[in-house]
Amino acid sequence: MIKDTFLKTNWLNISHHITLLVFGFYFSFYSLAKELVSSTAQPVNYYTHLLNVSFVGYIISLIGLSYYLSRQVSRQLFLKTSFIVISYLIVSYWVQITQHLNDKRFDIWSLTKNQFYQFQALPSLLIILVMATLIKILVAYFAIEKDRFGLLGYQGNTFSVALILAVVPISDIHLLKLISSRFSELVRAGNSQIALLKISGLLIVLLVIFATIIYVVLNALKHLKSNKPSFSVAATTSLFLALVFNYTFQYGVKGDEALLGYYVFPGATLFQIVAITLVALLAYVITNRYWPTTFFLLILGTIISVVNDLKESMRSEPLLVTDFVWLQELGLVTSFVKKSVIVEMVVGLAICIVVAWYLHGRVLAGKLFMSPVKRASAVLGLVIVSCSMLIPFSYEKEGKILSGLPIISALNNDNDINWLGFSTNARYKSLAYVWTRQVTKKIMEKPTNYSQETIASIAQKYQKLAEDINKDRKNNIADQTVIYLLSESLSDPDRVSNVTVSHDVLPNIKAIKNSTTAGLMQSDSYGGGTANMEFQTLTSLPFYNFSSSVSVLYSEVFPKMAKPHTISEFYQGKNRIAMHPASANNFNRKTVYSNLGFSKFLALSGSKDKFKNIENVGLLTSDKT
């Protein structure tokens, strides 16, 4: 089988495509060399020499690309070229707009200032097209055989055109500036040869990636024209949805200033676009249908975008993976949203279902994959790529993952802002990055010198200390009543910086504190977070001991504790009572208090025991209740 495949392979055609790739590389390298010369503030002898050498390769590549393209000159070629150039300008600018969501000075209509008109590659592309047309005319005029002059075995196809058109995105001024900055850093460090090798390899990889994307898009156009569902159509739609939802996700957490000199950290946008594309494409491959999957993704992406925006505005925190447990409390969730918004979403959902049903049997009807083997291979490939993005985060040490990995190493390692919380990380590193850390990061970092012996030694130390303290202690906590009253709205304004009050607003509480044992509790947020305060109160385990990727201790930490020890262990089950004026299922409370042996848990809903004679203050249950 392998031998037959080897013999049937058109190696001549493959060699021609490799030659096309080489021509594309020299074309791109010349564009990079020009950017290096124009942008560097260092002595330019090295860069000038590089520019002169690359110019020779550029001229050869112009001739070579024209020669190959002459076999495919047609009206369709000019239309495809125009479509790719215009589409790339729009996509590139859309990405730029997304990357400046945190820049309140960015004006999307200042097209010239924002370098929307990126025509760097256009003159060269026009030269290639004109030369290719002239070559075709001359070949026809002189009746020259098509396989003469080195084109023997060459079979021009869509990928050939895609390889040539890949020089358009490679010439993007923003991409060239990014590459040249990395190149200049290595050159200044005296590693010019290493820099040359790395940048050359990067250009080749980028050419192949861009050529593949263009090939898929051009194939999708062909299949759309023939009303044929295909993997290319699904992949193109996935990329389009990723570009749209990348914007809407980030819009929900946008700010108005730079952080560490960035409005969005390098790699954040690309990471999120790739992540969304992979998820969407996997959905298409699994369902093997176009329209139902498309509308499902549209609805899901819209809901995530809206909820993310609402949660950020209400709680200063983005939508997190752990928030999806609230799906079991849809009634409570919808109570936070205006009825008009819910009605609009329901109507939109109904319209989507009707349209999907109508289109399903008429436009792009049928399966995306007819072959189960190809479909399974696609699923496997997508899973492998997805895992390659997730696995490195699972093996991080001291907040750092393996260096040298494309996109994710720089995104995770270069700027450590985990301590700034979920909102800041989502704003500058993307919502997808925050979600990735949530599903991959360990709940607690392993401390230095951690071992069973070390823990036993610490336990022995404090056991002895407890015995010494309890020698003269007359009272036993088990014989006393302990009440924790946690109020989200209670705090002392005297402790808030830059705030002055005309008189003491908590005189009674301060008087009680002065006459008994008293202290302060650390709150990790301004209002809210009561469930986390409950966990810390019961277990004496502070929130800051856990990973920065942890959001809700009851949902993420408690279920993984083999034997959670709490202060409630000093009391019999019948004397353990909890009250919370909301749903018992919120933040996993019902399960937690059940596992801790509480005999009663009073809640507004979801529990056996409920509050009576409820009085509200505004929308919330009063203290009197």
Report each predicted region and the residues it spans.
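Extended, compositionally biased non-globular segments that define protein topology
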Residues: M1-T322
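Surface-exposed loop/turn and secondary-structure junction residues enriched for glycine/proline
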Residues: E145-D147, L152-Y154, T322-F324, F336, ...
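Solvent-exposed soluble domains appended to multi-pass membrane proteins
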Residues: E467-R473, S487, D492-T625
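Ligand-binding pockets and gating/stacking loops
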Residues: K113-S124, A189-L207, V233, L327-L332, ...
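N-terminal secretory/membrane-targeting segments
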Residues: I84-V91, V130, S160-V161, L297-G301, ...
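Beta1/beta-strand and adjacent pyrophosphate-binding region of the FAD-binding site
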Residues: I483-L485
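Envelope-exposed proteins and targeting segments
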Residues: A478-T481, M533
